[in-house]
Amino acid sequence: MAMLKYGGNAGRGGHQLTERTSEQVFAAREEAAAFFGGKPENTIFCLNCTHALNLAIQGIVQPNDHVIISNLEHNAVLRPVAAMVRERGVQCSIAPVSVDDKETIAAFRARIRPNTRAMICTLASNVTGQILPYRELAALCNEHDICMIADGAQACGTLPVQMSDGINILCTAGHKGLYGATGTGLLITDTKFPIKPLLYGGTGSLSAQVNQPEILPDKFESGTHNLLGIAGLNEGIKYVMNKSPQKI
């Protein structure tokens, strides 16, 4: 039924099916933005959290920049960072996470350098479930003009994660705490730190120009969306909003 209702290609036509599908994508974007306290145009649909994290990390960090990660990171963070260390001369420090939040914050603070570009950390560990003091870490980043990239895969939909917590770029999966389908993810940015696209191609907008559009979300959404997955993610977020707000 979803295929019959939302089987058009959003932004690529003017017939009824495509228009209905485009409206569904817009509605899902608004729902996700409202849930996390972001802006719809700054809410980017991705293939999964790994895709979102790669977009953020590779789009923000430049050669010879320094980044800080925690010792609890998923390979979705560790491997992109390791590749940039190996191939682009990026420097990386690993901050140990303690059961004492003050010690964790001190460990991150001690590793800040003049060329620190980003702090990339999970909000909650996928192994132990430990919740990092992400609001305090975000404040630390803001104090030093460092981009806070948050891996929210294990936290979003379970913890009350908001862009107002000081996160600059929030990356998350659709299929975990948001009850969406696999093959969906989100990146939400406050646009303080410009991101370079990871993919280039058709966006259904400004098709006569050879350069990638600068407007968001088009800049980061080349190619056909996972339209059925986005429709499911929209319903999942509505479920969390309507059925379990007291849990988050």
Give each language-model segment a name.
Residues 1-248:
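Pyridoxal 5′-phosphate
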